[in-house]
Amino acid sequence: MPFRSNNPLTRDEFLSRFFPQFHPVTTFNRGLSGGSFLIEHQGQRFVVRQPHDPDAPQSAFLRQYRALSQLPACIAPKPHLYLRDWMVVDYLPGEVKTYLPDTNELAGLLYYLHQQPRFGWRITLLPLLELYWQQSDPARRTVGWLRMLKRLRKAREPRLLRLSPLHMDVHAGNLVHSASGLKLIDWEYAGDGDIALELAAVWVENTDQHRQLVNDYATRAKIYPAQLWRQVRRWFPWLLMLKAGWFEYRWRQTGDQQFIRLADDTWRQLLIKQ
C-alpha cells in the first residue's frame, strides 16, 4: 500500500506511526549498496528498506515497489507499504549462501522471471555510464575511462535478443534458498531489458560457470547456446564499465575504501578484455 508524505520520517517516527507493536531485530548488510533492518511482532517479520543511493530520484525507489507489487511471491518478497524513503516487504526465511546455486537451478529462476509481464520501464546503460563519469571524483577520471565511454557511446547498446523484466543484481548475497525454492531480494535495479544483459551481469566465479549458466538457460529458452553466449559477450564491456563507474560513484559518495579496490580491479578486467 503506497502512502504519500512530503516530510521524511525518522526510523522511530516511521515505526511508531505504522508499526507501533513491532520492534527492530537486526540489521542486514548483505550487499554493497547498503543495509535494511528487520522488525518483528509475535513471530511476524517484515524487512524495512530505505533508498541505497541518497542522490537517486524518489521515482527509482517507487519503481522498486511497483516491480515487487507485480512479481509473484514465489520469486520475490511481497511489498506491504511504500512511503517516501521507506518500504516494507515480507521477510523471506531461508539461507543466504556465499556461493551461487547450481547453474541449472539458477537458470530456471531467471527464465521464470523473464517470462513474467514487463515492468514498463527500460534499462538503458549509457545514461548511467555518463552519470557515474560526471559524479565521480575528478581526480579519478582518466583519459582511458573517457575513451572507453566515447567508444561505447559511438557503438550504441547491442540489439535486443529478447526483451524481458530483469533483476540486474544477481549474486549469491541476493539469493535466498528457501524451503519452496530460490528467491531474489534487492530489486532496486530492476527494469526491462535484454535477457543476455541479465545473464552477463550475474556475479559468477569463473568463465566455466558462466558458460554453463548460459548453456542451461539456452536449453530452457530454446536458443542456440553459442548464439546466446555471443550476445552475452557483447554486453561484457558495458557491464564492466557500469560496475567500474558505480564503484567510483559510490567511492565519492561514501569514502569507503572497498569501492576504490573494487573499481581498480574492474578497470584491470576491462584492460585485459580489450
UniProtKB/Swiss-Prot annotation:
Q: What's a BP term from Gene Ontology annotated to this protein?
A: thiamine diphosphate biosynthetic process
Source species, domain of life: Bacteria
Is Transport set as a keyword in this record?
no
**Main EC class of this protein?**
transferase
Q: What is its EC number?
A: 2.7.1.89
MF terms per GO, please?
ATP binding; thiamine kinase activity
Identify the Pfam families for this entry. Answer: APH
Q: Give the record's pathway.
A: Cofactor biosynthesis; thiamine diphosphate biosynthesis; thiamine phosphate from thiamine: step 1/1
Q: Which UniProt keywords apply?
A: ATP-binding, Kinase, Nucleotide-binding, Transferase
Catalyses: thiamine + ATP = thiamine phosphate + ADP + H(+)
UniProt function note = Catalyzes the ATP-dependent phosphorylation of thiamine to thiamine phosphate. Is involved in thiamine salvage.
The Swiss-Prot or TrEMBL record describes its family as follows:
Belongs to the thiamine kinase family.
What's the protein name? Answer: Thiamine kinase
Q: Which gene encodes it?
A: thiK
